[in-house]
A protein has these predicted regions:
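N-terminal signal peptide c-region/cleavage motif recognized by signal peptidases
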Residues: 16-21
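Bacterial N-terminal signal peptides that target proteins for export
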Residues: 1-9
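Cysteine-centric segments in proteins
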Residues: 22-129
Length: 129
């Protein structure tokens, strides 16, 4: 019993997320292609990098776990047609949210439009063990 408690407390004290923590998996459709972006729990949300999706989008999923009062899952979609990343969609969910909007995870099925090129990106995200 004492060994099991040490195995749980040591990662928490070091600020490391246990390997059994949930992750966020986002499924993206753009231009007839499927993309996947995953987000691991992190205590440093500003260090998470976005992923380029096609020519005109960048997608970033952030699963912030600490501090506990600010823990959340944030989804950002940027338009990149001008050469710079411009935020065009943002969604935020409580970190304890479940996949209640099944079959489309906790976000439901979302549509995002890039205004200058009339491009459409679709996505949905789910928590996975």
């Amino acid at each position: 019993m004492q060994r099991a408690l040490k195995a749980w407390f040591v990662p928490v004290l070091l600020g490391v997320t246990p390997v059994w923590a949930d992750t966020v998996a986002c499924h993206i459709i753009y231009g007839g292609e499927n993309f996947s972006v995953s987000a691991q729990p992190t205590a440093e949300p500003y260090k998470v990098k976005g992923e380029k999706i096609g020519r005109y989008f960048e997608f970033k999923a952030v699963y912030a776990t600490s501090p506990a009062d600010l823990a959340a899952i944030s989804i950002y979609v940027y338009g990149t047609s001008s050469g710079e990343s411009v935020l065009i969609h943002q969604a935020k969910f409580a970190s304890g949210i479940g996949n209640d909007a099944a079959p489309w995870g906790f976000t439901g099925f979302q549509y995002v439009y890039e205004p200058s090129k009339s491009s459409e990106l679709q996505y949905w995200c789910e928590k996975t063990p």
